[in-house]
């Protein structure tokens, strides 16, 4: 097995060499390792022809895994008193959010949180006024379908739309959608951990590990990356389907994967990928036969998943000509390294004493000692079929999170088109976190069983819960967002095309545009079109005549200047615009103690 595994690793690009005292060993070709595996295999058959290749899997109903399969095949009743554990899980998942809950219009920064509020508001606007062009944003004029330049967060947008259309503040709606993700994740992990362990106390620990996972704090600005709660439930739904396949269970599995895809396209794609080794391991351990009922169940799941992926994927496919593909060089810069699983997120309070000199954005992947410790207990032998599948799929997610630094991600990139649009393979780290949280629940269940013999299980529950809460506590730095928009936007109409300066504050302008609806030559998203990147270079010396001509060619009809966001260069820019032919003032005022101006830009002759 070792030689065969070595052959696979070498074939995937893991060729290497090593030195033994007096000897240099070359592992450059898979054929030598494969030949060695064949020789060992023949020798093993010669010595023990009747011993199964995988004796640990057992045979027939006496298999050690059969009891677990029967548990998942049934629909066990909800345990008495479980409601209290659910309440504890939900409250624990929100305890470190308290500073933000007290100030629902505060944000950690003026980038992605503001962008998310604009996304939800723009989707609601299009849904109500132009549903045929649902993904058309008002950024990067004159490109269409600009909501597809990043994750459209369709699930959150559909839920938020009625509130925004009724007049609710989009930023508060977006923040509430953000907050909801934490208890939703905790409930998802609670349910999955309960189905795996049968212990509501262990489920509470699993829910806390998932709901407060370090990945949440690393990505505290990203709305869609908080929505991890469908993933553990989908894994459990797959187990249940393999245990007792029915079309209904297939539809349930498909719906969960579809919901994850609609909430976060990254996680939907990654979940579907990780489910392959996970399902294969469970099916192998349980010796699942390819019956007609299994085919029906999997077909039902596939239909639901295909419909959801196609419905959301089609607009992205249509805009692919503009967006192109992520080159592997760019993917490499957002690929994790194994050592970065030891780099804690900055907001993880218990580890702020550790230097962050070598940490990189998107790659602070340390899950916390409590998570690792409980997961280590969870993977101690003997292993169940589900635990084994979690270990294998977690290892696969870890390998894929390495992206260009790993062995197999380039194959995903080459053979599966959706992966050619993925910018950050390191986000597979969220799936590693899912596995660790579920294994942590298994570890907690083992500790509770061990403590029950001395009647210390209640004390063990309180201590473990307290340790998890302490280990995964967060320090949040928040700031209030502007309570009002600059007064010049009262003169802006939807037919205008704005060039707004300074250029690097696009999320703010996008949020202000929710009220006026004008289009913008600039914008902020996960992808920036070549035309905008070129325009940025052409307006570096704004307000020169050449830069104004570049804005005209880009389609701009008006210019805004915001001195509160610009600072020192602003008075010089205003003087230059006032003295430039073809630029005429439309509106002016003061906002947050500084000048703001709106100018009309005469078109090219």
Label each residue range with its predicted role.
Residues 18-30, 218-225, 335-337, 353-363, ...:
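Membrane-helix boundary/interfacial segments in multi-pass membrane proteins
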Residues 1, 37-97, 296-303, 380, ...:
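Start-transfer (signal-anchor) and selected internal transmembrane alpha helices
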Residues 91-185, 213-228, 334-358, 404-409, ...:
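Membrane-interface coil-to-helix junctions
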Residues 89, 93, 177-196, 200-284, ...:
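Membrane-embedded helix bundles of polyisoprenyl
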């Amino acid at each position: 097995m070792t030689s065969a595994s070595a052959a696979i690793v070498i074939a995937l690009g893991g060729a290497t060499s090593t030195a033994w005292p007096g000897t240099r060993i070359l592992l450059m070709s898979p054929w030598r390792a494969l030949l060695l595996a064949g020789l060992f295999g023949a020798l093993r058959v010669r010595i023990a022809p009747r011993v199964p290749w995988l004796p640990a899997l057992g045979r027939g109903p006496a298999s050690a895994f059969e009891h677990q399969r029967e548990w998942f095949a049934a629909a066990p009743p909800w345990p008495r008193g479980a409601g209290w554990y659910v309440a504890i899980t939900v409250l624990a998942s929100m305890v470190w959010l308290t500073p933000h809950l007290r100030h629902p219009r505060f944000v950690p920064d003026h980038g992605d949180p503001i962008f998310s509020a604009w996304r939800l508001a723009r989707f609601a606007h299009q849904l109500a006024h132009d549903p045929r062009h649902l993904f058309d944003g008002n950024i990067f004029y004159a490109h269409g379908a600009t909501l597809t330049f990043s994750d459209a967060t369709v699930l959150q947008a559909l839920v938020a739309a009625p509130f925004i259309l009724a007049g609710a503040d989009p930023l508060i709606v977006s923040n509430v959608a953000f907050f909801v993700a934490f208890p939703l994740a905790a409930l998802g992990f609670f349910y999955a951990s309960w189905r795996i362990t049968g212990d509501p106390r262990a489920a509470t620990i699993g829910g806390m590990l998932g709901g407060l996972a370090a990945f949440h704090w690393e990505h505290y600005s990203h709305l869609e990356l908080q929505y991890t709660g469908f993933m553990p439930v989908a894994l459990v739904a797959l187990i249940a389907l393999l245990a007792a396949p029915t079309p209904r269970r297939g539809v349930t599995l498909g719906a969960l994967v579809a919901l994850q895809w609609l909430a976060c396209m990254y996680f939907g794609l990654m979940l579907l990928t990780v489910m392959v080794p996970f399902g294969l391991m469970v099916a192998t351990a349980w010796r699942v036969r390819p019956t007609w009922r299994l085919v029906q169940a999997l077909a039902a799941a596939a239909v639901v998943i295909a419909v959801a992926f196609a419905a959301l994927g089609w607009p992205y496919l249509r805009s692919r000509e503009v967006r192109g593909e992520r080159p592997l060089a760019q993917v490499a810069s957002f690929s994790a390294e194994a050592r970065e699983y030891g780099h804690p997120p900055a907001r993880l309070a218990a580890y702020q004493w550790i230097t962050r000199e070598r940490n990189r954005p998107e790659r602070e992947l340390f899950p916390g000692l409590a998570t690792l410790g409980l997961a280590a207990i969870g993977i101690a032998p003997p292993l169940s079929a589900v635990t084994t599948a979690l270990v294998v799929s977690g290892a696969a997610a870890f390998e894929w999170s390495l992206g260009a630094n790993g062995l197999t991600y380039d194959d995903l990139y080459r053979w599966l088109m959706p992966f050619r649009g993925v910018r950050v393979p390191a986000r597979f780290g969220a799936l590693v976190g899912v596995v660790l949280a579920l294994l942590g629940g298994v570890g907690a269940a083992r500790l509770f069983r061990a403590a029950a013999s001395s009647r210390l299980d209640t004390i063990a529950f309180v201590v473990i819960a307290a340790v998890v809460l302490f280990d995964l506590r967060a320090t949040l730095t928040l700031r209030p967002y502007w309570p009002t928009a600059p007064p010049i936007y009262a003169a802006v109409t939807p037919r205008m095309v704005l060039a707004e300066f300074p250029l690097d504050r696009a999320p703010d302008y996008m949020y202000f545009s929710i009220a006026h609806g004008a289009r913008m030559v600039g914008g902020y998203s996960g992808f920036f079109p070549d035309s905008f990147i070129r325009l940025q270079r052409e307006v570096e010396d704004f307000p020169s005549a050449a830069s104004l001509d570049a804005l005209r060619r880009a389609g701009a009809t008006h210019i805004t200047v915001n001195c509160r966001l610009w600072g020192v260069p602003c008075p010089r820019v205003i003087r230059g615009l006032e003295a430039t032919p073809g630029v005429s003032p439309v509106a002016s005022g003061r906002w947050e103690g500084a000048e703001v101006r709106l100018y009309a830009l005469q078109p090219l002759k």
